[in-house]
Every structure is written in structure tokens, then in C-alpha cells.
Amino acid sequence: MFEPLAVKLRPNNIDEVIGQKHLLGENKILRNITENGKIFSMILYGKPGIGKTTIALAIVKQLGLKCRTLNAVINNKKDFDIAIEEAKMYKGLVIIMDEIHRLNKDKQDLLLPYLESGLIVLIGMTTSNPYHKINPAIRSRCQILSLIHISEPTRL
């Protein structure tokens, strides 16, 4: 099966990620997650193509955690129900959710009790300001991390 080049070259751990040193550098928040093995719910906020999904996948892969990737727009309630059942079966699951700013109220209400209990760890990604677009109940249970533009000297 055809695999896009971006997928083939995607980093397997945070050491392979270029840029975002304010989050991935020594003693920084995302570096500490991988070193301590303790993950928490977060929202990664930044422009398209800046590495939000790549960072989320690298963290999960590096920690060897079970995860499910969902899209707030494309996936329906049944997909969310399946993810919750997986979380119960595995006694925990990381949900990587793209376009979290477009998550409707029903899906938010469905996820909230599992976020609160710790059964689900949510890594949401958004290009929109999370303070304006994401439900305060979800937002209050997540650390909001802003990704910045990669400067020229950092690029390969």
C-alpha cells in the first residue's frame, strides 16, 4: 500500500522532532513526559503543518502507549464509543484528536467523564485559539501548549 513520504519520515520519538525547543528541550514539559513516563491531557495549538500531530504520535510511540487517532469532524459518536470501550479494555487509552476545536457538544459530553476519571488521556490538536473555541470543561482538564513557527536555522 502507498504510504506518503511525510508518514514514512515521521519521527518515532521526540529526539527526532525538529524545533519546538520550548516544549521539547532539556527540562521542558514534553521532554519531561517522555523521561518520567507520565502523560497528561493536553491541547497542542499552532499553525497547520507545524508538527502538532507528529509530536503527539512521537510521544505516544516513545512511551509505548495504546492510542486511537480521531478527528472531531470526521469521526462520529460510534467511533468515540468504540474508543471508550478500548480504553476500558486496556485500562487506559490516549486519544489523539485532530480539529478538537470542532468537537460538538455531544462528543464533548461523552468524553468528559472519562477524562475526569483518567481512563482517557486526550491530546487534542487545533489551529484555532483554544481559549475561544474549546469548551471550558474540556479545556480545564488539559494543559494548553502553543507550538511556534520553526525558524530558518532550525530547519534541515
Predicted regions and their residues:
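Pre-Walker A (pre-P-loop) alpha-helix and adjacent loop at the N terminus of AAA/AAA+ ATPase modules
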Residues: 2-41
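Loop/turn-to-beta-strand initiation segments
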Residues: 40, 91-94, 118-123
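Short glycine-rich substrate-engagement loop in P-loop NTPases that contacts/grips substrate
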Residues: 26, 67-92
